[in-house]
């Protein structure tokens, strides 16, 4: 389990990250990220819906994601909150596949967001 200070725990925090965060799809997961407070540690939350499978499968996917995230969370900037959502394909993914997906998503989260050019109308 992640330490208490490294978890996105409340419904309001989940909603904040899910709605206003940057969204990155990588393999069988989607990672929502938002920069919250600068001083706090990076935090993670997990969403594994019923479409992934029955309760046993969902809990297995959640445990795998949590374990893969634990070692990678420190690579994110301080104050970053991420919400990791498993897609139905995650049920058949190995821990190594989930780890590679997390690496790819976290690389994108760490990179600066490209500037949008102003549209002329």
From Swiss-Prot:
Residue ranges of the TM segments: none
One example of a Gene Ontology biological process annotation: tRNA 5'-leader removal
Catalytic activity from the UniProt record: Endonucleolytic cleavage of RNA, removing 5'-extranucleotides from tRNA precursor
Broad enzyme group: hydrolase
Span list, region Disordered: 1-20, 91-121
Record-linked InterPro entries: Ribosomal_Su5_D2-typ_SF, Ribsml_uS5_D2-typ_fold_subgr, RNase_P, RNase_P_CS
Molecular function GO labels: 3'-tRNA processing endoribonuclease activity; ribonuclease P activity; tRNA binding
Domain of life, per lineage: Bacteria
Entry's Gene Ontology cellular component terms: ribonuclease P complex
Keyword tRNA processing included in the entry's annotation: yes
Keywords assigned by UniProt, alphabetized: Endonuclease, Hydrolase, Nuclease, RNA-binding, tRNA processing
PROSITE patterns associated with the record: RIBONUCLEASE_P (PS00648)
EC annotation from Swiss-Prot or TrEMBL: 3.1.26.5
Pfam families: Ribonuclease_P
Functional note: RNaseP catalyzes the removal of the 5'-leader sequence from pre-tRNA to produce the mature 5'-terminus. It can also cleave other RNA substrates such as 4.5S RNA. The protein component plays an auxiliary but essential role in vivo by binding to the 5'-leader sequence and broadening the substrate specificity of the ribozyme.
Subunit structure: Consists of a catalytic RNA component (M1 or rnpB) and a protein subunit.
NCBIfam families xrefs: rnpA
Similarity comment text for this entry: Belongs to the RnpA family.
Protein name: Ribonuclease P protein component
